[in-house]
Amino acid sequence: QEYNGISKKIRYQTDALRQCGADVRTCHYEVGNDGSRKWMIDEDVLADLGKGIPAKIKKRLSFAPILQYVRREGIQCVYIRSYHNANPFTIHFVRMLKKQGVRVLLEIPTYPYDHEYSSGMEKVQLYTDKLFRHAFCRYVDFIVTFSSDDRIFGRPTIRISNGIDFARIPLRSPRHGTSKELHLIGVAEIHFWHGFDRLLKGLGAYYGNNPEYKVY
């Protein structure tokens, strides 16, 4: 989904890697307007999983089409963006990648992440992840993180910064003066980790000093 913030970040990363000379293919899961579920490689269908509950189950259990593609194309490195879904099936997937001699990098966008789960279903997913994540990471060469941690789940890290592609999002041309006031706008899905509460708390502290400069 091009409007999705996560999808945009992935696009920025793949574009940056291509600019560095890497041959990058993006494997992702797609749900069509007709309810069909597919594994995709860029714009091409890798595997049609069908529709309904059987397709949902296949998505979580069967990674054979991806493994076959990696072997057929001679892929040397697989970069996985973590969905906190370590389980016996994803462990089997990364173990088979290692058997093929593939280097595996796992990006964990937010770490630690245990506190991010609040609903009942999310806690079940987190419990499963806690049970299996160390076993999963045994087959991971490096964990990519935005944090300052040297090691995560026993694996060495590669520390990067979370940025944007200015070629896709140009700097805004100023149209209004900011000498008297500043208007802020939040453009995102509103989840607690986006920090809107911290912004409001900061504004409250700011206005507690009766400032002349107004921020809205």
Predicted region positions:
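A short, glycine/small-residue-rich beta-strand->loop->alpha-helix junction that serves as a flexible
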Residues: 1-11, 82-87, 191-194
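Carbohydrate-associated surface elements
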Residues: 149, 163
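Membrane-proximal helix-turn-helix segments that form the acceptor-binding/catalytic region
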Residues: 64, 88, 92-100, 110-114, ...
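Short N-terminal targeting/anchoring amphipathic segment
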Residues: 67-88, 101-105
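Acceptor-binding helix/loop patch of EC 2.4 sugar-transfer enzymes
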Residues: 49, 105-133, 165-167, 171, ...
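N-terminal subdomain of nucleotide-sugar transferases
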Residues: 1-33, 73, 142, 198, ...
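A short, charged, and often flexible helix/loop element on the N-terminal side
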Residues: 29-65, 80, 120-124
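Conserved donor-binding/catalytic core segment of Leloir-type glycosyltransferases
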Residues: 175-194, 200-203, 216
